Regions:
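Conserved donor-binding/catalytic core segment of Leloir-type glycosyltransferases
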Residues: 1-15, 21
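Short alpha-helical segment that forms part of, or immediately flanks, the ligand-binding pocket
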Residues: 48, 70-75, 89, 93
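Short alpha-helical donor nucleotide-sugar binding micro-motif in glycosyltransferases
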Residues: 49-54
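A short alpha->beta transition loop at the rim of the catalytic pocket in nucleotide-sugar-dependent
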Residues: 55, 75-77
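Aromatic "clamp/platform" in nucleotide-sugar-dependent glycosyltransferases that forms part
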Residues: 61-62
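Short hydrophobic beta-strand element within catalytic cores of glycosyltransferases
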Residues: 79-84
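A charged, aromatic-enriched C-terminal amphipathic alpha-helix characteristic of glycosyltransferases
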Residues: 120-151
């Protein structure tokens, strides 16, 4: 079976789409069994449908936060590669360093090849990302966080 890889850039320059395409092309030339799907100008519903059947998501490679698409990908149990880095963006939860494969723009090919060569790592990152998304980005998690902030600041008891 092929490994389905999705990239859904809202802005192809900011998301590193040219790097993604070059990496995918090189892996195809090397005969990796992959299905690459690039989704541009698609509704969120279409993107979410693709995420349900995807293994790896190539998010964005010039930013230091996961963004909504990164969270949606993790919540759909995909292994995510992106440049979001909690050592740079210190506002990210500390357990985020293991939730996705931190990938600088010059590492897209190498890190994607690493996952394809080590399929057990795809599942490992998918599991960690899924747990991370549901720990930090549900209505319940947001409610707990807001209540904690309000209590810590004496607004509510």
């Amino acid at each position: 079976d092929s490994i389905k890889i999705v990239h859904a850039p809202s802005n192809s320059i900011n998301k590193g789409t040219q790097l993604v395409r070059a990496s995918i092309k090189k892996l195809q030339i090397e005969k990796y069994n992959i299905e690459y799907v690039e989704l541009q100008n698609m509704s969120n519903q279409v993107v979410l449908e693709h995420l349900k059947s995807s293994h790896i998501v190539l998010n964005q490679f010039y930013t230091f936060t996961p963004g909504l698409f990164g969270i949606e990908a993790m919540a759909n149990h995909c292994a995510v590669l992106m440049s979001a880095d909690p050592s740079i963006e210190t506002g990210l939860p500390q357990d985020s360093k293991d939730a996705w494969l931190i990938t600088k723009y010059w590492e897209v090919y190498d890190n994607l090849k690493y996952l394809l060569d080590n399929p057990e790592k795809i599942k490992q990152y998918a599991d960690r990302g899924y747990d991370f998304a549901y720990k930090h980005y549900t209505y319940e998690a947001a409610s707990e966080y807001i209540n904690k902030v309000l209590k810590d600041n004496g607004v509510i008891e």
